[in-house]
Amino acid sequence: MAGREGHFRLIAGLGNPGSKYAGTRHNAGFWLVDELVRRYGGELREEPKFRGDCARVLIDGYDCRLVKPMTYMNHSGQAVGALANFFKIPPEAILVAHDEIDLPPGSVRLKRGGGHGGHNGLRHIQSTLGTPDFARLRLGVGHPGHKDQVVPHVLSRPSPDELRQLERAIDDAADQIPRLLAGEWDRACQQLHA
């Protein structure tokens, strides 16, 4: 598969493996990767050396690697770091899709760099890469209202209405991936942040 090198060469969708977590809010990043695989004809394969399920797809002519880390959320950096090291992908060329409790269900926001905001998957990726300088695609799953309820909230399934909102957000985000690969960050932000 030969394609142009896009602005982002690796898209990591965060989540937890296994049927127990399949429909939970914490797996929103997995759902985005699944949608990209569906749209662009890729095939996710277990790649033990990369600690995740990986695919390589062409998106509007851009060669892009996708990964769903199979390390559980708190060790997501193992998969992202392994791929980045092997394929010599700098942090600036990595986009990480993840659930975001600080956004209402159905919201999508792009962010370059910054802190982890208490998200353990981002924390581990930042630690593994040695920098926060990777991009994030934040998929809103809403906040439960109290910090003691955050873990049960993200590890539970969304209501039917929230699920519809999240699915729409994932579609909207997937629609903008070609723009992001083309380096049209501002235009993608305008579409998603509107």
Swiss-Prot record:
Query: Source organism's superkingdom?
Result: Bacteria
Which InterPro entries does the record associate with it? Pept_tRNA_hydro, Pept_tRNA_hydro_CS, Pept_tRNA_hydro_sf
Q: Which CDD domains match?
A: PTH
Gene3D superfamilies, per database record: Peptidyl-tRNA hydrolase
Q: Does the record carry Transferase as a key word?
A: no
Give yes or no: UniProt keyword Hydrolase: yes
Query: Which residues are listed for tRNA binding in this entry?
Result: Y21, Y72, N74, N120
* Residues at the catalytic site: H26
Query: What's the stated role of this polypeptide?
Result: Hydrolyzes ribosome-free peptidyl-tRNAs (with 1 or more amino acids incorporated), which drop off the ribosome during protein synthesis, or as a result of ribosome stalling.
Q: What is this protein called?
A: Peptidyl-tRNA hydrolase
Species name for this entry? Answer: Halorhodospira halophila (strain DSM 244 / SL1) (Ectothiorhodospira halophila (strain DSM 244 / SL1))
The protein's gene is named pth
